[in-house]
Amino acid sequence: MALLWQNLFRRLGSKPDKPTKEAPDLYYNIAPIDATGAIYRLIVGQRSNGKTYSVCKHIVEDYFNEDKRGAYIRRYEESITPKNLQSLFNPHLQLIWELSEHKWNAVFYRAKEFHFCAIDSEGKIIAKDDTAFCITAAINTSENTKGEDRGEVHTIVFDEFMTRSGYLNNEFVRFMNLLSTLIRDRENAVVYMLANTVNKYCPYFAEMGLKNIDKLAQGEIAVYTYGSSDLTVAVELCDEVQATKKTASKYFAFDNPQLQMITRGAWEFQIYPRPPYKILQEDIVLKFYIQFAEQLLACEVVHSTMKQYCNDVFIFVHPQTKDINVDDFTIMYVSDFSSCRMHVRFLKDQPTEGHKLIYSLIQRKAVCFSDNDTGEVFRNWLQEMQGVKLW
């Protein structure tokens, strides 16, 4: 049987899962965030640090030790096809073999269900567990199965909940509806939300009332409570792990700040344009403000008074660090409805010539920033609030 076991691993292209004393230091350790007892556990860190590995291992152990099932969620249906998910639990095949007392040596995935199974040396399934230990679902198609009871689940995983390429319309509410379908009236479910450090202004943070996420230090866990409610949310910004250090220093040590997400787990950002010259007070022809994700951006339409730059017209964006009194005559882009004519939610709302000018300059990408972090706020505002992708 030992020879069959090794042959199966060679055929599956997966190494046996042999935990060692060094494992918690080499890869991400789920124990600290589990110790919080939070209902929602958000784990954010560098790529390939073991986030998904750790939670999937937890699902396997929960099934064998406590007879509890799991659920794996992604944003899009295409991400949960057999082609993309068949090998999700392969790193844990030896653990499965041991916990099942040598009954199961593989995992079978079909019809959005993972089952333990036994395969022979030819790779044929000779026995299968009738009960799925983990089911899958996608947010973008969840309305099709709304109200369907797929059985009790305990550990729910939303993998890659953050993205730089845009979110579904009303995604947070759709995610909550999907959770409602999975959890139903059961009170023992735990929700893990996993992501790489790709976007510190993710809309989930605002929707869940998670403040100062950008202030978290690596290795820190913040726990949020909600008044007298039993709801708790823990957010962990993963510390750098040993397993990725050597690869990172060998392949990704170029002098590019964007690569720090890969090398150290730092937040990813782009390099945004800076003003081409010093902006004088007399160059500013219009001021407006953008309110987004607990941030207030001050924006200035600049038309240079210098002869050599007299044709330049652009928007300069920087953080508004001081308190201001915004009157009804100031252009402001807000997150919620306002009865003030000058305060609008969308760029397409253009009640004045000033609004039209702002829209035109943004369309032409005639925008520069005080720093990259401000550029990230602006980019996310454009993408999430305006449905516009320029960077």
Model-derived features with residue positions:
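Phosphate/NTP-binding elements of NTP-utilizing enzymes
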Residues: 2-391
